[in-house]
C-alpha cells in the first residue's frame, strides 16, 4: 500500500527509549543536545516579534511564487549588510517555509530519479530523509580532521559519477563547525566545471563565527551554479516563524533558467503565507539583538568546556570555527550509542553519539553550545567524571 521511499525504520532507537524512561522517572536530565533556541532561555521581545505579524496588508492575498518583493528585498539587505554581497537581485531569491523545503525544491530541479548528490560526511542526518522523498541517491565524501577539518578532494573526485548532479556543502558544517575555506571554494568551483554539477550550500549557521569575523557567503559565488540556502530559524533564532530561502547565483544563463524552473515549482505549492513575509524585515533585523547573546553563550560554554578538559586529558574537543555545536573526542572503549545510553541512565546527561552524524569511527560525542550555561557546566562535569570512571 505504501511507497518504498517511505519505508523507514520507524521504531524508536535504544537511546530514545532510554531517554523516555529517564524522563518518566522524574529525574533531572542535563540535556546537552538542545537545538531549539526558544527552549534554551534565549528569546526576543515578544511584543516586537508578534507585533510584526499584525499588518493590514496580510488581509489581501497576493500569490507571488518567488515570494513578496518586500521580503525578498529584506533578505538582499541582510546579505549586503552582514556579508557584503552587494549585487544580489531579489529575482535571484525563492522564499520557502524551511530549508528542508528549499532542499526539496533544488533536488527536484536538478535530479531525475536515482541521480546522485554528493554529501559531506560527517554531517546532517536529515539529508537521508530529504533524498528518499525526492528519489535521489546520496553519495558521501569525507571531511578529514588534521588540526581542523578539510574536504578530502581526492575522495570527492572518486565519489563523482556521470549521475552526479550537485555537491552539498554545509557552511559551517553541522556538527564539525568548519567553514569552507577560500581555497576549497576555488577547488569546488573547478570540480563543478569538470563534472557539470551545481553547489547546494546550507548557510543556516553562517553568522555564528566564534571569532566574530564575518565569513563570506556563497550567495556571491558566480563561478558555478550555486544554490545558497538559509533562513531566520538560526539567523534570528526564530524557528517557529517559518521563513527560509534559496539564492541562485552563478553563470547568468544558468541562473535565469534555474530561477524560471524554481518559480514553477514554488508556484505549484505556494507554501508561503502573507503575515510572515510582511514581517520579514523586522524578523531579519532582530538578528542584531539575538546573535550577540547567542555568541556570548557559545563562547562562554566553549571556554567552560576547555577549562574542565584540563583536568581530563583522556578527552579532547575538536577544533570548531562556528555554529552551535562542538565535537568531543572520548576513549573509544565502546560504541558511541552505548556510551550515550549509559550516560543517560547513570549520570542523567543527554548527548548525541557521533554515529548519528556518520563520524568515521567510535569515540565521538556531539554537544550543543547553546545549552543554558548552568546546565552545560554541570552536564560536562558529570560527563567527564563518568568517562573517567
Where are these regions (language model features)?
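N-terminal small-domain helix-loop-helix segment of the aminotransferase-like
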Residues: 2-98, 105, 155, 283-286, ...
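Helix C-cap/helix->beta junction micro-motif
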Residues: 25, 134, 194-195, 347
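Conserved core of the PLP fold type I
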Residues: 58-190, 194, 206-221, 227, ...
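Short Gly/Ser/Thr- and Asp/Glu-enriched loop/turn motifs at secondary-structure junctions
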Residues: 88-90, 319-324, 362
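PLP-dependent enzyme catalytic core of the Aspartate aminotransferase-like
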Residues: 154-157, 342-351, 357-389
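Walker B catalytic acidic pair
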Residues: 203
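Conserved core segment of the aminotransferase class I/II
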Residues: 220, 224-299, 307, 387
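Conserved glycine-rich beta-strand-loop-beta hairpin in the small C-terminal domain of fold type I
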Residues: 281, 297-306, 316-330
Amino acid at each position: 500500500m505504501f511507497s518504498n521511499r517511505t519505508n523507514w525504520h520507524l521504531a524508536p532507537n535504544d537511546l530514545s527509549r532510554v531517554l523516555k524512561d529517564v524522563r518518566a522517572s522524574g529525574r533531572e536530565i542535563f540535556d546537552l543536545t538542545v537545538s531549539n533556541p526558544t527552549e534554551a532561555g534565549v528569546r526576543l521581545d515578544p511584543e516586537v516579534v508578534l507585533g510584526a505579524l499584525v499588518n493590514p496588508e496580510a488581509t489581501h492575498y497576493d500569490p507571488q511564487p518567488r515570494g513578496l518583493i518586500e521580503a525578498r528585498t529584506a533578505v538582499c539587505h541582510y546579505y549586503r549588510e552582514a556579508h557584503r554581497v552587494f549585487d544580489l537581485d531579489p529575482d535571484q531569491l525563492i522564499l520557502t517555509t524551511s530549508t528542508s523545503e528549499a532542499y526539496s525544491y533544488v533536488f527536484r530541479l536538478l535530479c531525475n530519479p536515482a541521480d546522485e548528490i554528493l554529501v559531506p560526511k560527517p554531517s546532517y542526518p536529515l539529508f537521508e530523509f530529504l533524498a528518499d522523498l525526492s528519489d535521489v541517491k546520496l553519495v558521501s565524501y569525507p571531511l578529514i580532521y588534521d588540526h581542523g577539518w578539510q574536504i578530502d578532494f581526492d575522495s570527492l573526485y572518486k565519489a563523482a559519477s556521470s549521475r552526479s548532479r550537485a555537491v552539498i556543502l554545509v557552511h559551517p558544517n553541522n556538527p564539525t563547525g568548519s567553514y569552507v575555506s577560500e581555497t576549497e571554494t576555488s577547488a569546488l568551483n573547478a570540480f563543478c566545471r569538470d563534472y557539470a554539477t551545481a553547489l547546494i550550500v546550507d548557510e543556516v549557521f553562517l553568522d555564528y563565527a566564534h571569532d566574530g569575523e564575518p565569513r563570506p557567503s556563497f550567495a556571491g559565488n558566480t563561478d558555478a551554479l550555486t544554490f545558497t540556502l538559509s533562513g531566520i530559524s538560526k539567523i534570528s533564532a526564530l524557528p517557529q516563524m517559518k521563513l527560509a530561502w534559496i539564492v541562485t547565483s552563478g553563470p547568468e544563463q544558468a541562473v535565469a533558467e534555474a530561477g524560471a524552473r524554481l518559480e514553477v515549482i514554488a508556484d505549484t505549492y505556494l507554501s508561503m503565507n502573507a503575515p510572515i513575509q510582511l514581517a520579514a524585515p523586522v524578523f531579519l533585523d532582530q538578528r542584531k539583538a539575538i546573535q550577540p547573546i547567542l555568541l556570548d553563550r557559545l563562547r562562554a560554554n566553549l571556554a567552560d568546556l576547555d577549562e574542565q578538559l584540563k583536568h581530563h586529558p583522556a578527552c579532547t574537543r575538536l577544533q570548531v570555527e562556528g555554529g552551535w555545536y562542538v565535537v568531543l573526542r572520548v576513549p573509544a572503549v565502546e560504541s558511541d550509542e552505548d556510551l550515550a545510553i549509559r550516560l543517560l541512565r547513570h549520570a542523567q546527561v543527554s548527548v548525541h553519539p557521533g554515529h548519528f552524524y556518520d563520524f568515521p569511527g567510535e569515540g565521538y560525542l556531539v554537544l550543543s553550545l547553546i545549552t543554558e550555561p548552568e546546565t552545560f557546566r554541570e552536564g560536562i562535569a558529570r560527563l567527564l567524571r563518568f568517562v573517567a570512571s
